[in-house]
Regions:
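Conserved histidines in hydrophobic membrane contexts and catalytic metal-binding motifs
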Residues: 1-247
């Protein structure tokens, strides 16, 4: 569908598994640009006032003040979205590290594969019995990235609040449907789980999505005004541009 195509474009650039790693580069540059811009804008804000737009100046100065004003107002939001986007680009690597460092400690547990597994409903019921207030979100099958060779991993979500976005895995013996363990997710897995809905504005329903869309449009305005300033700079050097900010 067109929506899924846009999601894939945003998340992978349609490049497959390498896409998120490629996207990590502009994410880092975006954060660096925000931090350096805040450092440059700081002296001007102390002198003229926060989000000040000067009147009676050149068109380029008007664009500069618009760029600075919009960027200063939504700086914190852009940093949050940039940082969570960067975390998301590392998602597969983070999960793989978790599998090798912590899930691997359960690798030898469980019944060796016999070609027959317990019914999936029985496996899910065993996980829910461990956490009655939680709801199943997805099941990772043996041999997949988020499970082991001898066990299914049932990932549960809490009933409300932050627990709704943090997964709790329950490892179930694939043959006997016995609970092998329920390791608490480490901080970096929780950070990944929380960053995904925060990046896309999924915490507050439609209202937050509308706010996120407006902030996205404002960010586009910041980027466009920055491009206009770069193109119109002409022969001005970096020292001239800094002087124009402070003028």
């Amino acid at each position: 569908s067109p929506t899924q195509w846009l999601v894939d474009l945003h998340g992978t650039l349609l490049l497959g598994p390498m896409g998120p790693l490629v996207l990590g580069v502009p994410a880092v540059l975006f954060i660096v640009a925000l931090v350096s811009g805040a450092v440059i804008y700081g002296p001007f804000a102390r002198k003229a006032g926060f989000a000040k737009v000067r009147g009676g100046r050149t068109t380029r100065t008007a664009w500069l003040d618009l760029h600075n004003m919009l960027g200063a107002v939504i700086l914190a939001w852009m940093l949050v979205v940039g940082a969570t986007g960067l975390i998301n680009t590392w998602g597969a690597s983070i999960i793989r590290f978790w599998q090798m460092s912590e899930l691997s400690t359960y690798a030898a547990q469980g019944t060796p594969p016999t070609g027959r597994t317990a019914p999936i409903d029985t496996i899910v019921d065993a996980a829910r019995a461990r956490y009655p207030d939680f709801q199943p979100y997805f099941v990772a099958y043996p041999g997949s990235l988020m499970a082991g060779e001898r066990f299914h991993a049932v990932y549960l979500r809490g009933p409300d609040g932050l627990k709704e976005h943090i997964f709790q895995p329950v490892l179930i013996d694939s043959v006997t449907a016995r609970v092998i363990g329920a390791p608490r997710p480490p901080w970096y897995i929780s950070a990944l789980a929380l960053s995904q809905p925060l990046h896309f504005g999924d915490y507050g329903g439609l209202t937050l999505k509308v706010i996120w869309a407006l902030l996205d449009l404002t960010t586009i305005a910041v980027l466009v005004s920055g491009l206009i300033l770069t193109v119109s700079k002409g022969r001005k050097g970096p020292h001239d541009s800094l002087a124009e900010v402070a003028a």
